[in-house]
Amino acid sequence: MSVRFQSDDEYMRNLITTSGISIGTQVKTKFMKQFISDTDPTGTYTLDLEATQGRIKAAAQFIEHTGASELIVCSGKDSARVPIRKFAELVGCKDIHKRFMPGTLTNPDLPKYMEPKLLLVCDPQVDAQAVTEATNAGIPVIGIANSDNVTSRLDVIIPANNRGRGALAAIFWLLAREVLVIRGEVDETKPMKYEIDDFETKDVREDE
């Protein structure tokens, strides 16, 4: 999907819709009820577009306030490997795109022990170990959550489809762009270094 960013609300809605960001699941948790706007004939929930856009902006502001160098973005999903690497490259944070080793945030004796001030995860269930350790260490957590996720340990929820490769690419592209716009490094009416296609994992085997 090759796109040129515009601040126009209609354009943004089209981008979110075509990328599948707003596609939920057929399960709704009490935590995600507030972010659901509709249900399609198959019983699949639709996530609220305005809420998604608003939370992406809030997350970007949180990241910039904390400092991207203090952020770790991680995911145990194969489909998220390219999106989080591109995101980390653009905003200047650290990424963990393979297995999250227990103790990474809580055991100073580990060689790869880290002390971030903020954590970003793609799925609070898949990335439960990272979320648990961050919570125990007092580290705030930003999480992308679908309609069936439990979000009780997330400080900032980005309601979005966290399953689809295209959706993950779009989410991280939008979030990276928003961070760069806040910094003044990108003009919101012009293309940036990468397009959404560049953020998508084409083949989950490519990182193996």
Swiss-Prot record:
It comes from the Archaea. The keyword Ribonucleoprotein applies. PROSITE patterns: RIBOSOMAL_S2_2 (PS00963). Gene3D superfamilies: Glucose-6-phosphate isomerase like protein, domain 1. GO terms for biological process: translation. The keyword Cell wall biogenesis/degradation does not apply. Pfam families: Ribosomal_S2. Keywords: Ribonucleoprotein, Ribosomal protein. GO terms for molecular function: structural constituent of ribosome. GO terms for cellular component: small ribosomal subunit. InterPro entries: Ribosomal_uS2, Ribosomal_uS2_arc, Ribosomal_uS2_CS, Ribosomal_uS2_euk/arc, Ribosomal_uS2_flav_dom_sf. HAMAP family: Ribosomal_uS2_A. Belongs to the universal ribosomal protein uS2 family. This is Small ribosomal subunit protein uS2. The gene is rps2.
